[in-house]
Amino acid sequence: MQMKNFKEDFPLLRENPVVYLDSAATAQRPESVINSEMEFYKKCNANPLRGLYDLGFKATECYEQSRETVRKFINARSEREIIFTRNATESLNLVAYSYGMNFLKKGDEILVTVMEHHSNQLPWRVVAEKTGAAVKYIECNPDGTITEEQLKQAFSERTRLVAVTHISNVLGCKTPIKRITELAKECGAVVVLDASQSVPHIPVDIQSLDVDFLAFSGHKLMAPFGIGVLYGRESLLEKMPPFLTGGEMIDSVTRDKVIYSDLPHKFEAGTVNAAGAWGLKTAIEYIQNIGFDTIGGIEEELTKRAFDGLMKIPHINIQGSNNPKEHCGIISFTIDGVHPHDVSSILDADGIAVRAGHHCAQPLMEFLGVPSTTRASIYFYNTKDDIDAFLNSVSSVRRRMGYGK
């Protein structure tokens, strides 16, 4: 397919020769997002939800318009179900502490997959320690697939909460979330979905997925740092106590009684990141203008190009599926005899940015039998030249490490 060069929309990529292949960690920001955040500070800079003057009203309007944009983007039923946070980590911790600590008890079981990012594992382990609930793992296969048998082995009449990733940040594979949700409903469990790696790449429809909570970070879909989203089913959010307390999340306070604000502000204590929310709105609009069909088509072609090229290089071991279409732009690999950190350093010397390490998924690394991997993650602003430069550099790693070839 003929690809548009989207790098022109991104100041860092336009003005810097870097080959950026670490979008699963954070995406680059288009000029429109950078400008929108600056415009907020130039024209609307006041404390939202507080100032009873024109500038304060404008700031509040921007903030709430951003919430409505997010609601439409993920097809939530009400803006009351959209909570702004700092990132997916905070969103998941909010659910763990506000829901898990209050509604789970000794003997209950929490299911997570072995592929989870630590942000969707550790909060549940803390909940288990505090409540007496138990964390159980849904096993997967080396290619990241989860079978019906593996699901049924994990679920039981004690399952009360299931926390799963939508797309693995290591293997790029999709979990069978609709089937997981069906099984969860059969035993009365709620489902918490980490959509950090899916929201930037594929359409995410809350009502179709029918999950109870969903979390993602803005920065992975080109929004500013410091803005994240938690979707929560309204009937559950209504029952949950606040996660943080302080300014602007109360209706009234006396010496003897506190009445908390209505949704969604009950969960947004303190001064909010209105500029970040406005930048998130712009990032969503930018994605919508391009379209997920275009984004997916570019990513699929470039992933196949990278995958096929790596398969031709000796001593390369790709983690996950043998089908590049099942990687969602994420390719984790190892090179025989070379530590991933050394691979990353060599590629960095060639102007190529990739991630090396355990990717905050150490139980998955243990399952795969590797301490760490090198990860290349592709987004629609990458080009064929980027992939070719990456492959050329990877092919030289063993020689440059003194192996000859």
Give each language-model segment a name.
Residues 1-405:
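Pyridoxal 5′-phosphate
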